[in-house]
Amino acid sequence: MEDAIERLAEHVVNTNLSDIPNKAIQSAKTYVLDTIGVGLAGSTGPYVKELLNTYSLPSLPQVTSRVLGQNVKLNPADAALINGFQIHNSEFDCVHEEAVIHTMTVLLAVIFADADRRGGISGSKLLESAVLGVDVACNLGVACSS
């Protein structure tokens, strides 16, 4: 008998963009654009320069990933951290109230950094990743708060 985690993993692995309802795809497009917008706005927010100064060390390996609104590339983990900070620092990022999670902040910061590391991804793969990530994160959040 498979457990809930196995079912969740199978759902993610076996779901393609064509399986996702159009309404979810349209919502994802809106939320991706919104998240990019608040991330760019947050690029001039408090403590961003301090974070960039801390994480912009030239000796770090795998400097491949861009930071929103900044003329800098960092290793993927650091770029994801700073992008997430910038997206969230003005508190205009979207939140799933029931799951109590800022899903797009966490997911897109990582998706963008990983896409740069890989040399890019298609828009459809970005949307598929975002929709499935939101699905997993929100369901786990709701399960934990129930």
Show the residue positions of the predicted features:
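N-terminal core-entry segment
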Residues: 1-146
